[in-house]
Amino acid sequence: MSLIPHDLGRQGEDAAASWLLCKGYRIIRRNYRYRRNEIDIIAMDDRTLCFVEVKTRATIDKGHPLEAVTPQKQKEIIRTARAFLCMEYHEEIDCRFDVVAIIAKGYEKGRLKEFDVEHITDAFWAE
C-alpha cells in the first residue's frame, strides 16, 4: 500500500522529529510559517538553533530527496528563519540549516514503518 504525497510528507516529518529527539535534539517548533513559506522543524542541538528541512520520498526513482532542496528553497528557508529570529527569538544564538532526507522502505496499514534517514548538518548557509 502506498501513501498520498501529503500523508507521506507528514509521516516523514514525524519520523525526522522522532529521529532528532533520539539524537538528543530538543524540538522548539514544528511547521513554522511565515507568509507563504514554512520551516519543517526548529530544534536545539546543544546550544545551536537548527532550522531543519525534511524531504521524504517513497523511492529514489525520480531523484534523491536532498536534490529537492534547491537554491530557491534554501533562500525561502533562510528568509523564514530570519523572520523567526526577529519575531520570536530575541537573543543572540548560533544557528545552522540542516536537511533530513527520509526514504521510505516499508508501510503497514498505510503508515510509514521502515525508512532510511540521512541527516546533513550545515547543509547550506545564509549569506
Curated annotation (Swiss-Prot):
Which InterPro entries does the entry link to?
Restrct_endonuc-II-like, tRNA_endonuc-like_dom_sf, UPF0102_YraN-like
MF annotations from Gene Ontology: nucleic acid binding
User: From what superkingdom does this record's organism come?
Assistant: Bacteria
Q: Name one Pfam family in it.
A: UPF0102
**HAMAP family documented for this protein:** UPF0102
Q: According to its UniProt record, which protein family does this protein belong to?
A: Belongs to the UPF0102 family.
> This chain belongs to which protein, by name?
UPF0102 protein Paes_0016
Q: Which organism is it from?
A: Prosthecochloris aestuarii (strain DSM 271 / SK 413)
